[in-house]
Amino acid sequence: MPPSGPQGTLLLLPLLLLLLLRAVLAVPLERGAPNKEETPATESPDTGLYYHRYLQEVIDVLETDGHFREKLQAANAEDIKSGKLSRELDFVSHHVRTKLDELKRQEVSRLRMLLKAKMDAEQDPNVQVDHLNLLKQFEHLDPQNQHTFEARDLELLIQTATRDLAQYDAAHHEEFKRYEMLKEHERRRYLESLGEEQRKEAERRLEEQQRRHREHPKVNVPGSQAQLKEVWEELDGLDPNRFNPKTFFILHDINSDGVLDEQELEALFTKELEKVYDPKNEEDDMREMEEERLRMREHVMKNVDTNQDRLVTLGEFLASTQRKEFGDTGEGWETVEMHPAYTEEELRRFEEELAAREAELNAKAQRLSQETEALGRSQGRLEAQKRELQQAVLHMEQRKQQQQQQQQQGHKAPAAHPEGQLKFHPDTDDVPVPAPAGDQKEVDTSEKKLLERLPEVEVPQHL
């Protein structure tokens, strides 16, 4: 019986979802067994799901309940996916349910923040919101109950994550396909932009890079005897003539949980990938290397993972070594460049999509340019009106000053007496002297015109 301990408290869940629980199936509980020295817990790999943290926390809480852990041991993949296991949540201890309730309230709070962000974005027409993706954020929770964690929540969490992870690899393949099509599209556009001689030289250089990339040692089929023996010899430093599948499995079950998960499997392919890809070489694309790693892992899972739970048990691994294909070397593994990720028709549609997107962006840029020019012209008119207003105000002030000077000069000059004698008038500075009729009329007219124009002029706030 495998040793018990903290690493034996997790259960395998189909389709990588509950990868964090995988050790429970491999390590049964031993009641009354003496406590053994605890080994440091290994960090669980990120599933890539947007609710990964919530999923991880729910698993950590559930595995502390002895009753649920025992039911988890006895459950098979179908029990988990169908929701049968979720009903056992009714029998977990009160403090476990309390912790689960708090986790759900925290997740609901997080989703409410997302909803608030969505509403804020809707109020701004310039913000593009993917409403469908936002709504998907809620699919792993029971919308009828926002406060307590029930069996329905566990069932939804399992079903949603199982479905999402089943689509995870497909999404990666699609992303790689678009990457390859964009790369080919840019290559063709680059060649079209060159003159005839330059284009021939560029094509020759590209062909040379492709030739160097194809020249590599034979790549063994992942999971084959040749591939595993190479790891056994070069990575483990053991005698290839004494290859033992069971020992190999134990050596590469890094966290000793009784299964090889996807990360542990992918680590076995490093030596094969190094034959083809070198980050120092211009001709080797590291994005292609990661796609190659994914293809290798899928190949092994398809042929070894008989129950399709995305984990390889010791029994499944040993059974695969008995198959005829295990020792068949053949011509080796066919790499990515031997299997184009897209067809010419797919590339044509992709380029049409790019052209439409480019046209849309150009139209938007043109509209923005026109709006900028219109704002510039409006600003110019505003500046002209401001200068005209300033000149009118200055002119009016000058006229008033002239009138005041004329009034002062006319008031203080002594009047001549008819007999030739000067006659001085008493001081009447306190009495207002009206301006000449003609001048006063002209000032009134100027002020009236100025006041009539004021509503038409929008003076900036900084004036």
Curated annotation (Swiss-Prot):
Annotated localization: Golgi apparatus, cis-Golgi network membrane; Cytoplasm; Secreted
Coiled coil residues, start to end: 150-218, 341-409
GO MF annotations in UniProt: calcium ion binding; DNA binding; G-protein alpha-subunit binding; guanyl-nucleotide exchange factor activity
Homology family: Belongs to the nucleobindin family.
One Pfam short name: NUCB1_N
Record-listed Phosphothreonine modification sites: T148
Modified residues (Phosphoserine): S86, S369
Free-text comment about domains: The EF-hand domains are unfolded in the absence of Ca(2+) and fold upon Ca(2+) addition.
Record feature DNA-binding region, as residue ranges: 172-218
Binding site for Ca(2+) 2: D305, N307, D309, E316
PROSITE patterns: EF_HAND_1, EF_HAND_2
Record flagged with keyword Transcription: no
Organism for this UniProt entry: Pongo abelii (Sumatran orangutan)
Gene3D superfamilies, per the entry: EF-hand
GO CC term (a single one): extracellular exosome
Assigned keywords, A-Z: Calcium, Coiled coil, Cytoplasm, DNA-binding, Golgi apparatus, Guanine-nucleotide releasing factor, Membrane, Metal-binding, Phosphoprotein, Repeat, Secreted, Signal
Domain of life from the UniProt record: Eukaryota
SUPFAM superfamilies, per database record: EF-hand (SSF47473)
Chief place where the protein resides: Golgi
Basic and acidic residues bias locations: 193-210, 439-463
Residue ranges of the motif GBA: 303-333
Annotated binding of Ca(2+) 1, by residue: D253, N255, D257, E264
Signal sequence extent: 1-26
Name of the protein this chain belongs to: Nucleobindin-1
